[in-house]
């Protein structure tokens, strides 16, 4: 009997449950999709190093899922609160007819169970379909062989989804039971006659608070842009964040009175059509949702900023790979003179240390050949070079230029190369080569922030003393270039001098850049594997040698890009649907409560088109308000993130911002449209 009542109630209130159903199904689908990546990655044919990166990504996503489940759990309980409130009169009738509160709780239990089962089944079906597309995206990201691709259903992700959402629904059932047990019959029966207590705030006080909020927010914006130099520790970064949250709350608390004061003074706008009705409705609503609107605004801000940053990082890590990694492999090794100096103060050298010191007398190719790796057989287009330590520091090359931002590297030894060595590397990389007179030097750099500082010094014609001889700059600016392969422009400066400017005993590092003698990807992987196995045995075991490769850098950049993108997408979608769902549920509840007010408009002669437009404006303003402030926050948040990314040599976020805004518009706009259509259905008279 109670089960039949529950089933009938769900059918009858289907339009009230539309947003709730939509959110639950979407939440289940997203939860399954991101947790199914673990099972789908098993079928990817990738190297062991790449599989380790994928495993790390899956572990991170699993941890994020715990946080996501808390967000969704809060959302479901919040939604249940509104749905129960909508049905207070119905529950009052049940009690009047003699039904006990325990039986009402059982009805709610069955309703929650049915909704849970339907949403889980529908969400898992949609999630399974979407996960197949996710498999293709993951495979493309990691450049995996798709020959083993097949339709896959992740039982592990399914069980995890069922467990997590089962816990959420149990909490909802407990909450519903608790809510019903506290209800009084008189309150339930009079629920439709009661309106939420709304206190219209003093407009003068609101204006003052609004100005204070804007002032605090302006200072927070200044801190993350012009005053960014003061934010040199993590705890200091929290200051503008805290100020922004407080200012956001103050703005939402005061905006109703502020808007009333502004618009009532503009008679032509206030009394046009039903604008006065729309404004009063919005202001009364914002007065009772200050905290939740603040939270929604902050979640939208986090979504826009984090997703833009993640997509920008992914693009920056992958787009310059070919130009920044023009060779297949690069090896480096400490020289004998450098290591002899390091061991000079050591009183007791082990046998292993003596062997490594002896090996430092050999070239990189000799070390490889002695270890069983035939460099001539596996390498081609080889460029060998030396990095020298002449005692010059970064501060010496900058002279009296203000280096407050780079104090930490002022005493760093300036790497020096001869023009002959640099040109041999540049020719191999396809970069520009240069010529020098006997008394000239060049600074080669590509890290933009440091290039700007160095250019100031070069324009002043700062002379440098190397081994007792003075050298002047050949150019009044840095020349673009690099020696160390990587994925970002992080060369903060190499001093290039004539071949006779340095001494052999000043060699600090030996370097080698080369391509593999291979024609296919398989052959490259084969050589890479042999070299990798060798390096595991000799790198800092029998030799002061290290290495890097294009394949390894590509895998690392792709892995990091995928990691930040998936986590940002996961959190972004959840934050978006949570924010939009809370607004939608609140609006639907208010539409039901205000049905009589819209009926009054009809009695006053307002036609349906104007009523629909009034509803559209009201819902539009309610949805737009937190979004507009979040977008303003994001402008300054993204500027701050741009500064951080620039210090890592990453590019602008312009392209990723557009993609993020489109993503927000689709999900947030979709909820707005559903809310408007459902609200319009609620307020229209029954025919």
Task: Name every feature range the model reports, one short phrase each.
Residues 1-28, 196-212, 253-300, 593:
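N-terminal Sec/SRP start-transfer signal
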Residues 4, 182-198, 592-593, 681-687:
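Short cytosolic juxtamembrane segments of multi-pass membrane proteins
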Residues 14-20, 108-126, 162, 166, ...:
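Selective transmembrane-helix segments that form parts of the transport pathway or gating/packing helices
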Residues 15-22, 33-67, 83-85, 227-247, ...:
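Peri-transmembrane interface segments
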Residues 29-43, 78-82, 115-144, 157-182, ...:
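Small-residue-rich transmembrane alpha-helices
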Residues 34-35, 65-92, 104, 176, ...:
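A hydrophobic alpha-helix feature that marks transmembrane segments and, especially
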Residues 321-562:
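Nucleotide-cofactor and metal-assisted catalytic machinery
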């Amino acid at each position: 009997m109670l089960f039949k009542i529950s089933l009938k109630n769900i059918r009858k209130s289907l339009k009230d449950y539309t947003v709730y159903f939509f959110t639950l199904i979407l939440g289940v689908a997203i939860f399954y999709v991101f947790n199914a990546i673990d099972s789908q990655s098993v079928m990817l044919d990738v190297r062991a190093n790449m599989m380790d990166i994928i495993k790390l990504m899956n572990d991170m996503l699993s941890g994020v899922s715990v946080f996501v489940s808390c967000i969704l759990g809060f959302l479901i309980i919040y939604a249940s609160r509104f749905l129960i409130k909508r049905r207070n009169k119905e529950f009052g009738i049940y009690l009047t007819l003699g039904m006990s509160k325990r039986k009402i709780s059982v009805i709610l239990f069955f309703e929650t169970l049915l909704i849970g089962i339907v949403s889980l089944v529908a969400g898992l079906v949609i999630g399974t379909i979407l996960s197949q597309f996710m498999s293709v995206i993951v495979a493309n990201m990691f450049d995996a062989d798709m020959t083993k691709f097949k339709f896959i259903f992740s039982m592990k992700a399914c069980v995890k989804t069922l467990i997590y959402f089962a816990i959420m629904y149990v909490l909802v059932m407990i909450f519903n039971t608790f809510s019903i047990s506290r209800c009084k019959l008189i309150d339930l029966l009079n629920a439709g006659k009661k309106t939420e207590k709304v206190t219209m705030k003093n407009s003068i006080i609101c204006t003052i608070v609004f100005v204070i909020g804007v002032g605090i927010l302006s200072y927070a914006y200044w801190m993350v842009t012009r005053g960014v130099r003061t934010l040199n520790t993590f705890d200091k970064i929290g200051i503008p964040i805290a100020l922004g949250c407080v200012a956001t709350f103050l703005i939402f608390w005061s905006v109703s009175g502020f808007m009333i004061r502004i618009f009532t003074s503009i008679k032509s706008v206030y009394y046009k059509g039903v604008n006065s009705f729309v404004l009063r409705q919005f202001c009364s609503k914002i007065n009772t949702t200050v905290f939740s609107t603040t939270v929604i605004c902050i979640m939208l801000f986090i979504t826009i900023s984090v997703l833009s940053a993640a997509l920008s990082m992914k693009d920056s890590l992958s787009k310059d790979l070919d130009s920044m990694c023009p060779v297949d492999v690069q090896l480096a090794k400490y020289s004998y003179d450098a290591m002899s100096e390091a061991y000079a103060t050591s009183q007791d050298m082990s046998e292993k240390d003596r062997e490594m010191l002896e090996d430092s007398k050999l070239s990189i190719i000799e070390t490889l050949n002695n270890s069983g790796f035939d460099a001539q057989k596996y390498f081609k287009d080889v460029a060998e070079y030396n990095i020298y330590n002449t005692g010059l520091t970064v501060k010496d090359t900058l002279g009296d230029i203000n280096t407050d931002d780079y104090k930490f590297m002022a005493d760093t030894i300036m790497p020096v190369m001869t023009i002959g060595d640099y040109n041999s590397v540049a020719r191999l990389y396809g970069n520009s080569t240069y010529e020098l007179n006997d008394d000239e030097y060049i600074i080669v750099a590509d890290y933009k922030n440091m290039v700007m500082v160095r250019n100031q010094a070069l324009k002043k014609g700062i002379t440098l003393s190397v081994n007792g001889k003075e050298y002047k700059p050949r150019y009044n600016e840095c020349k673009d270039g690099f020696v160390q392969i990587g994925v970002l422009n992080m060369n903060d400066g190499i001093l290039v001098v004539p071949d006779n400017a340095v001494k052999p005993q000043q060699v600090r590092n030996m370097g080698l850049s080369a391509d593999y003698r291979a024609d296919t990807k398989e052959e490259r992987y084969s050589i890479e594997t042999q070299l990798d196995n060798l390096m595991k045995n000799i790198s800092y075991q029998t030799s002061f040698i290290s290495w890097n490769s294009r394949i390894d850098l590509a895998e690392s950049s792709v892995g990091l890009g995928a990691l930040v993108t998936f986590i940002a997408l996961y959190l972004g979608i959840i934050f978006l649907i949570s924010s939009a769902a809370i607004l939608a549920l609140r609006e639907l509840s208010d539409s039901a409560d205000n049905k009589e007010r819209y009926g009054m408009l009809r009695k006053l002669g307002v036609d349906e088109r104007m009523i629909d437009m009034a509803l559209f404006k009201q819902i539009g303003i309610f949805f737009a308000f937190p979004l507009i402030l979040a977008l303003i926050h994001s402008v300054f948040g993204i500027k701050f993130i741009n500064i951080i990314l620039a210090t890592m040599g990453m590019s602008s976020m312009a392209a990723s911002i557009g993609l993020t805004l489109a993503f927000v518009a689709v999900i947030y706009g979709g909820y707005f449209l559903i809310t408007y259509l459902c609200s319009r259905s609620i307020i229209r008279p029954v025919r």
